[in-house]
C-alpha cells in the first residue's frame, strides 16, 4: 500500500507538479527512498532555476551588447555616408567626419575587447598563473604609468602601505587589469578631485588594497550596482566619460578567481 502511494506521488510530480514533495511517513527502508526522491526533485528544480537565470543573463548580455554596439556603429555609417555622398563643404569638415568615425570605431573596439575579457574571466576553465610579488611595488609601477594622464587632469596618484615589501602570490597580469580599471574610473569620474590614493595593508592573513580619491562621491543608491555588468552611474553618462560598463564587472570576476572580494563604500 505504501509503495502504491509513493508511485502515485511520483506520477503526480512527473506530471509537472515540481513544487510537490512526498510528505507522508513510510517504513524505514522506503523512507530513505522517499527522502532521496525529494532531494532529487529539489536538485532538479534548483538546476532548472539556475539554467533559467543563466539564459536570462545571456539574453540581457546580448541586448546590452547590441545596444552599445549599435550606437557607435550608427554614427560611423552616418559619417561615412556623408563622405561617400561628398556632403562636406571643406577639407576641414571632411577631416572632422573621418575623425569622428575613427573615434566611434575605437569605442566599438574597446567594447569588444572588454566583452572578450569579461567572458574569459567568467569562464569556469579560466586558469590563474600566480607568482610571488611585492604589492606595493606593483602599485608604484601602476601609479607611474598613469602619471601623465593624471597630470593632464591636475591630479596626483599617491601610493602607501605596509609592510614594505608586502609580498603575496597572485596572477599579476590579471590583478594589474583590476587596478588599471579602478584607476581609470578614479580619473574619469573623480570630478573635482586632486588625488588618487592607492593603499595596501596586510591585515591578518589578507592583503587589503584600497583605491580612493578626494573627488565627488558615488551616490549611495549606485554603490550596490557598481559591479553589475553594463551598469553606469547615470550622472556619468557622457561622451567624455562613458565607458563600456564592463570594467568593474571584469575586476570583480578577477578578484573572485583569486578567492577574494571587492566592494565600494
Q: PLM features: what roles do these ranges have?
A:
Residues 218-232:
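Short conserved segment of the HATPase_c
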Residues 193-205:
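Short beta-strand/loop element within the Bergerat-fold HATPase_c
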Residues 259-260:
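Conserved glycine-rich
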Residues 129-132, 151, 156-166:
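Conserved catalytic submotifs in the C-terminal HATPase_c
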Residues 186-187:
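Short helix-loop "hinge" at the ATP-lid/N-box region of the Bergerat-fold HATPase_c
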Residues 129-144:
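A conserved beta-strand-to-alpha-helix junction within the catalytic ATP-binding
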Residues 2-12, 21-39:
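HAMP signal relay modules and closely related sensory coiled-coil linkers
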Amino acid at each position: 500500500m505504501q509503495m502504491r502511494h509513493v508511485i502515485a506521488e511520483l506520477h503526480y510530480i512527473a506530471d509537472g507538479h515540481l513544487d510537490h514533495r512526498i510528505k507522508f511517513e513510510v517504513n524505514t527502508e522506503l523512507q530513505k527512498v522517499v527522502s532521496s526522491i525529494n532531494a532529487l526533485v529539489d536538485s532538479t528544480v534548483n538546476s532548472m532555476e539556475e539554467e533559467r537565470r543563466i539564459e536570462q543573463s545571456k539574453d540581457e548580455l546580448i541586448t546590452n551588447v547590441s545596444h552599445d554596439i549599435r550606437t557607435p556603429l550608427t554614427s560611423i555609417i552616418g559619417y561615412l555616408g556623408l563622405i561617400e555622398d561628398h556632403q562636406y563643404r571643406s577639407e576641414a569638415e571632411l577631416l572632422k567626419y573621418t575623425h569622428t568615425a575613427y573615434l566611434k570605431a575605437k569605442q566599438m573596439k574597446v567594447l569588444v575587447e572588454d566583452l572578450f575579457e569579461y567572458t574569459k574571466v567568467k569562464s569556469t576553465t579560466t586558469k590563474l598563473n600566480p607568482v610571488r610579488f611585492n604589492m606595493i611595488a606593483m602599485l608604484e609601477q601602476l601609479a607611474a604609468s598613469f602619471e601623465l594622464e593624471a597630470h593632464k587632469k591636475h591630479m596626483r596618484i599617491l601610493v602607501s602601505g605596509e609592510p614594505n615589501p608586502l609580498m603575496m602570490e597572485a596572477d599579476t597580469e590579471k590583478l594589474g587589469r583590476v587596478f588599471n580599471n579602478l584607476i581609470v574610473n578614479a580619473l574619469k569620474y573623480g570630478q573635482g578631485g586632486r588625488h588618487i590614493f592607492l593603499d595596501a595593508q596586510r591585515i591578518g592573513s589578507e592583503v587589503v588594497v584600497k583605491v580612493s580619491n578626494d573627488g565627488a562621491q558615488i551616490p549611495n543608491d549606485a554603490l550596490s550596482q557598481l559591479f553589475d555588468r553594463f551598469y553606469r552611474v547615470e550622472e556619468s553618462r557622457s561622451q567624455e566619460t562613458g565607458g563600456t560598463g564592463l570594467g568593474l564587472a571584469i575586476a570583480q570576476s578577477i578578484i573572485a578567481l583569486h578567492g577574494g572580494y571587492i566592494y565600494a563604500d
